[in-house]
Amino acid sequence: KAISVEKYAKKNKLHFIRFECRGHGKSSGKFEDFTISDWKKDLIDVIDNIAKGPQILVGSSMGGWLMFLAAKARPSKVAGMVGLAAAPDYIDGFYNDLSNKKKEELNKKGFIKYSSYGFSYIVKKKYIIDGRKNKILNKEFKWNKPLILIQGLKDNVVKSYIPEKIVKKVKGNQIQIKLLKNSDHRLSEPFDLKVINECIASAIKKN
C-alpha cells in the first residue's frame, strides 16, 4: 500500500513521507518495548520536524488510530485523513478477545506471548494500560476537514461496523465511508490500491 501511494505521489508531484513505527517492520527496537503513546509521539515528531505544510494523513489499521491522535494534537497541520481499515481504540477489543487464561497470565506476569497472521510477539500489560489512555472514541471529536474511511467487508481483523462506530463520534461535514465488498484487511489488491489513491486525490481536492 505504501509503495502504491508513493508512486501516486511521485506521479502527481506531491510531497510524500512514510515511516514504520518503532518495533515494526525494518524499524529499530522490539514491539514489546513501545506503546501507543510512543508511536503517537513519533508521528507528531515527523509532522513537526520533517513535514512541510498541512498533511493528508494515511493510516492503516493501528496507523489509523495514530492518525486520529495526531490530528487531535496538531489540527492546524493536518488537512485531511484517509483511514485504511482504521482501528482506533482496538485495545479493548484485543483484551476482551483474550482467553481467561491469557488475561490471568497477563495480570500475573505483566506480559503474554501472542500470535497473529503467523507472527509471534510479546504484549505487555503497560501496552494495554497505555492504549486505554489514548482512546479517541470515548467522546465526540470535531473534524471539519476530509475524512475517508476505507473498509473491506472480508476483513476478519477490523470488523465492518467499525467505520460507522467512528463516524458516530467524529463530527464533521466531509466524512465518507467506502465499503469494498471483496476486500480483506490488507487492502492490497489492485482495485483496493486504486480506491486508496482516488480517495487521497479527493481529500487533496477539497483543500
Regions found by a protein language model. Give the residues of each.
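Catalytic histidine-centered segment of alpha/beta-hydrolase-like enzymes
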Residues: S183-V195
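Alpha/beta-hydrolase active-site loop
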Residues: D33-I50
